[in-house]
């Protein structure tokens, strides 16, 4: 079996099991058993359970952030035409839905995992997400703040989180 195939099998199994059982309740042994690979394969390819979790999130967030940043660049290329609040909110949803799925329920599983990341104690993951993907989200939030100056930034922040949470829990 090719290394890349092993990595994909592990990530697929991890996504499914973490979404079903949560992070703490899912062991590496359970993941490798479901993936049909040797237990040592996780340490070889990822180094740790934390790194596996981060790699799992990168599968969706990497392409999503690239497409979100591209779309923001495209819309901001014409500074004389500012997008509306509704357009910016639509951009976020459109880019999330535009990530090419590997299977039919990828987005649903990812949203469930994202909800778990914030409801279970996954401090390492929150820190990782901020370090790796925070730049594009900060840019997005600044644009929202510009087009909705009457709303306090903290309120916009929580409204966007509520919107994403509603999307996550409805899938």
Predicted regions and their residues:
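N-terminal intrinsically disordered/low-complexity leader segments
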Residues: 1-5, 75
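Helix-turn-helix
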Residues: 9, 17-59
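Conserved phosphoryl-transfer catalytic core
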Residues: 51, 60-76
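Hydrophobic alpha-helical connector segments
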Residues: 70-108, 160
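Amphipathic alpha-helical packing segments from all-alpha helical-bundle domains
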Residues: 87, 105-109, 122-148
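Short alpha-helical scaffolding segments that buttress acidic/His motifs in well-ordered protein cores
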Residues: 92, 96, 111-118, 163, ...
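All-alpha amphipathic helical-bundle segments outside canonical DNA-binding/catalytic cores
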Residues: 148-164
């Amino acid at each position: 079996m090719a290394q890349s195939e092993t990595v994909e099998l592990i990530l697929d199994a991890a996504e499914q099991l973490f979404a079903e059982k949560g992070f703490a309740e899912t062991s590496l042994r359970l993941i490798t058993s479901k993936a049909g690979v040797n237990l040592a394969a996780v340490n070889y390819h990822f180094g740790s359970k934390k790194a596996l979790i981060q790699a799992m999130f990168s599968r969706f967030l990497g392409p999503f952030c690239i497409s979100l940043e591209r779309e923001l660049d495209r819309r901001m290329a014409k500074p004389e035409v500012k997008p509306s609040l509704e357009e910016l909110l639509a951009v976020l949803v459109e880019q999330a839905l535009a990530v090419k799925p590997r299977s039919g329920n990828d987005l649903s599983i990812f949203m469930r995992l994202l909800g778990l990341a914030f409801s279970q104690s996954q401090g390492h993951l929150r820190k990782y997400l901020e370090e790796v993907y925070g730049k594009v989200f900060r840019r997005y939030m600044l644009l929202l703040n510009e087009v909705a100056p009457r709303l306090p930034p903290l309120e916009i922040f929580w409204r966007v989180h509520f919107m994403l949470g509603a999307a996550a829990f409805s899938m």
